[in-house]
UniProtKB/Swiss-Prot annotation:
Disulfide bonds: none annotated. It comes from Phaseolus vulgaris. This is 230 kDa cell wall protein. The keyword Acetylation does not apply. It is found in: Secreted, Cell wall.
């Protein structure tokens, strides 16, 4: 398995 660095979470879109 290749090393995968931590991925930042996707941007959260606020729902109104």
């Amino acid at each position: 398995n290749m090393y995968l660095p931590p991925v930042p979470p996707p941007p959260v879109v606020p729902t109104f």
